[in-house]
Amino acid sequence: MSKISDFIGKSAVENVNEALRRAREIEEYNALLSLTEERALERAEKVDAGEISGRLAGVPFVVKDNFLAFGAPTTAASKMLENFNAPLQATAVEKLEAEGAICVGKANLDAFAHGGSTENSAFGPTKNAADKTRVAGGSSGGSAVVTALDVVPFALGTDTGGSIRQPASFNGVVGIKPTYGAVSRYGVVAMASSTDTIGCFATNAEDTDLVMEIMAGRDDKDMTTLPDFWNNQPEFAKKKIGLVKQCMTDDVDAEVRQKTLDYAEKLKRLGYEIEEVDLSMMQHSLAMYYIIVPAELSSNLARYDGVRYGHRAAEVKTLAELYGRSRNEGFMTENKRRIMIGSFVLSSGFFDAYYMQAQKARTLLIDEFKKLFTEYDALLMPVAPTPAFKIGENASDPIKMYLADIMTVPASLAGLPAVSAPAGNSDEGLPIGVQLIGDYKSDKNLLKLVSEVEEI
């Protein structure tokens, strides 16, 4: 099943040139914001000369354009960082390059990763790999599309509330949000520091596992990282999986529900018992998320002021005007909306009523997950209520857009690993994914489970 293995042992220069050729062939999807051609070919020549080696020697990959990486600007798909060239690389990128992998480009996203469709990019929306009239999902839409269209065998993304899992589902690839702290966030543009995670897309679980194993582990530059646990996880022993009943109601598209049930049948064939379970705090998770995350991102985005770095407004007369105009010109509408929400819930009059209450509710959600994992190896649910929607369909309705995250934010708030796995296509040919959520530090076991289903 591995596609990465197809690149191993071949000419790295040929691998890179083929990836660049494919990237140019799919320009109409607007999945890539830049190519790192010059640097990629330089590294490829060193691989072929034996100067660079490793488990991924000569394998091309793409990073979401909120990862700092050499060879092209890091824009976060925003005007604010349009011409920003990073002085360093993200730890995740460094680890992959240390194993010989070659970054060939940077993928489109919702600006600053604020969105669920990759429509909120300053450089235009990314189109779905299966249907160019539909969204790619977000915020890591570009990374999902280049993986689905075989530009590269894997691509990196970030997942704060579903930003890997949802585009993976919409484009028919595997995507993982790891345990919080599994992979260093150093060198990645911060969104919400308590839920940001680094993951990847691939066409199969085996490749996903390899990439994550390489990236995982302690990093002194990110104090939230965990000691490497990737290959030290106890096997699933309960042989029971919980099907979350809140996700199987009439509010969820009928085809999505059926594909989830079909996936459950495959798990039964592997010897797992499937039982319906109650995740009652899920109904409050979206409200928690859209209080906690905007609060954190409004603080993280305060650094973009037109003084230290980023877009700077021209012809200003006062410092206040410089701050105001630089941020107004550099941020997209969705960025401003989330900053305003975050500033509101952190204000002195509402901090206790909103932010602190959301954090208390978050603890209850975590406790509910903990209780379920005393009985079940994993939880099964859809990734999103529907397959990919039309470009522009939800663009003017932020609440409807936020509701698409209802099934992905619970695992994010709890810091749990979750994998989006392809489950087939709708009658219209649109990919549908299912989500497997595991207990803390059970990431590899989830991918092993997906791999076993892939073989059925």
List where the protein language model places each region:
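A short helix-breaking turn/cap at a secondary-structure junction
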Residues: 177-258, 263, 321, 325
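Short, well-ordered beta-strand elements within core beta-sheets of diverse protein domains
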Residues: 3-10, 62, 80-84, 196-203, ...
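Gly/Ser-rich catalytic/binding loops embedded in alpha/beta enzyme cores
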Residues: 1-160, 262-270
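Short alpha-helical scaffolding segments that buttress acidic/His motifs in well-ordered protein cores
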Residues: 15-19, 288-289, 335-343
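Short glycine/serine-rich loop segments
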Residues: 89-90, 94-215, 412-423, 430-433
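Residue-level signal for inorganic ion chemistry
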Residues: 19, 40, 89, 208, ...
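Acyltransferase
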Residues: 13-16, 45-48, 252-278, 310-311, ...
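Glycine-rich, small-residue loops and helix-cap segments
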Residues: 58, 152, 274, 296, ...
